């Protein structure tokens, strides 16, 4: 969670400066990576806090028929100046910062909500770690249970 991330950031600062304690503030994030990492972390946190995460749906086309057979859901972040940030810029860092689960849960909720309003098939990219995460696993299970039988 964001609270754990902030606590870890303060703890890293405390250890690096060999002080008795540290109180979190956004400038402490600078110690945990270079300026680019710092900038991306700020954008991830801002996107989570301000609902600036969104899904795009990439068509999957059957090579024989040249028709769309389903869509793949892909996460994006609306960054500074409304620029779109692709996962290659933030997913690895989000895992290191304990923010990844927020992004995964967003995508699961987003895609299941989309499935309720459309007849198209949509895939979600999840890893074995996502499946093994109890909270994520429970979310997927609960969403599937609530999904009408014909939409599963």
Regions found by a protein language model. Give the residues of each.
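Nucleotide second-messenger and two-component phosphorelay signaling modules
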Residues: 16-18, 46-50, 62-64, 80, ...
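Signal-transmission/dimerization alpha-helices at domain junctions
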Residues: 13, 93-97
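Generic recognition of well-ordered alpha-helical segments
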Residues: 5, 9, 39-42, 109, ...
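Active-site core of bacterial EAL-family cyclic-dinucleotide phosphodiesterase domains
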Residues: 35-93, 125
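Catalytic strand-loop-helix junctions within cyclic-nucleotide turnover domains
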Residues: 1-3, 18, 27-33, 60-65, ...
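Catalytic/regulatory signature loops of cyclic-dinucleotide turnover enzymes
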Residues: 5-26, 42-54, 81
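Catalytic core of bacterial c-di-GMP phosphodiesterases, primarily the EAL and HD-GYP domains
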Residues: 1, 67-71, 97-152
């Amino acid at each position: 969670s964001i609270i754990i991330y902030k606590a870890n950031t303060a703890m890293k600062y405390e250890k690096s400066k060999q002080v008795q304690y540290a109180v979190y503030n956004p400038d402490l994030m600078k110690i945990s990576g270079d300026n680019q990492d710092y900038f991306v972390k700020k954008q991830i946190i801002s996107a989570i806090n301000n609902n600036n995460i969104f899904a795009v749906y990439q068509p999957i086309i059957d090579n024989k028929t040249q028709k769309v057979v389903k869509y793949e859901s892909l996460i994006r972040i609306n960054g500074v100046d409304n620029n779109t940030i692709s996962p290659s810029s933030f997913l690895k860092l989000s895992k290191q910062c304990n923010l990844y689960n927020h992004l995964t849960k967003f995508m699961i909720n987003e895609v299941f909500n989309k499935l309720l309003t459309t007849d198209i098939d949509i895939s979600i990219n999840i890893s074995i770690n996502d499946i093994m995460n109890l909270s994520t696993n429970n979310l997927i299970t609960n969403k599937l249970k609530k999904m009408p039988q014909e939409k599963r």
